[in-house]
A protein has these predicted regions:
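N-terminal secretory signal peptides
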Residues: 1-53, 57
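Mature, soluble, non-transmembrane domains
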Residues: 44, 58-143
Length: 143
């Protein structure tokens, strides 16, 4: 949380690995997926947005990505747009801000509704990575 406290979620991402933030748009009441990645220096990028219809606050940014149709979804793919560290105000249960990573789903709305959280990344040494493979951070989801 931005206001302090223990992290809600710790993901040991490898460079290029992706995680998804999934939620229900509060105005359109439609599902949204935002796919993010991490580069070797620890910068966060948004790679793709997927939704049923353009809604309030959604849509293509000129020169960023490519709009395609994938089944029932509008998808902006190949974005690779740097977000860096960012703050998300977690929505209520029903909005269900959920982080999807390596087959796990962590519903942040169930843990901390209406709380501002910071998504941030820091490169770690191979030794730290090896240590956390044996002894995962308490906020890392079990796979």
């Amino acid at each position: 949380p931005v206001q302090g406290g223990a992290p809600l979620l710790v993901l040991p991402l490898s460079p290029g690995e992706r995680f998804t933030i999934h939620y229900t748009h509060s105005v359109e009441n439609a599902p949204i997926w935002e796919v993010h990645s991490l580069d070797p220096s620890g910068r966060i990028f948004i790679e793709e947005e997927r939704y049923v219809t353009f809604g309030a606050g959604m849509g293509k940014m000129p020169g960023v990505g490519r709009l395609v149709r994938r089944g029932p979804y509008e998808v902006i793919e190949d974005m690779h747009w740097p977000t860096g560290n960012f703050i998300l105000r977690i929505g209520s249960p029903g909005v269900d801000h959920t982080v999807i990573w390596r087959g796990t789903r962590t519903n942040l709305s169930a843990r901390a509704p209406h709380v501002a959280v910071q998504f941030s990344a820091t490169p770690v040494s191979w030794l730290h990575r090896a240590w956390r493979q044996v002894f995962p951070h308490p906020a890392t989801p079990s796979q």
